[in-house]
Amino acid sequence: MGYQEKKQIVLDELEKSLGAVKEEEVEQFVDMICDAQQVFVVGVGRVLLMLQAFAKRLNHLGIKANYVGAIDEPAITEHDVLVVGSGSGESVVPLEIMKIAKKYNAKIVHIGSNEHSSMKEYEDLFVRIPC
């Protein structure tokens, strides 16, 4: 299988996944980010790597973004948004971070695939990416 065939497989997968994401959830997510004073991201493993890249891109756009656990991480406030990436919605560390952020009245966005997870009671918005 050559490059073009492999490329098409990847593009088809992306189209299938992103085509199932609800536009109104993404629009609300964007609005929450734009309205926040700061954006924080948390996840585990590969999800965390992608969220760190996302935070970097937000900073390039002039939106102050941090990842939880960074040495220079500021405090979260009620004016901020926490973006949690967890497909299962059961990742222990992100779930505990959500609980803390909720105590500070931060807005919480959960990006994942399981809409009936333990994170449900803490999220203000769930953006489902089916897999």
Could you tell me what each predicted segment is?
Residues 41, 47-131:
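Glycine-rich phosphate-binding loops that contact phosphosugars or nucleotide phosphates
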Residues 18-35:
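A short, well-structured juxtamembrane/interface segment
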Residues 4-5, 29-30, 72-74:
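Short, flexible segments with low predicted structural confidence
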Residues 1-20:
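Generic N-terminal amphipathic, Lys/Arg-enriched alpha-helix
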Residues 16-23, 63, 131:
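Generic secondary-structure signature for well-ordered alpha-helical cores
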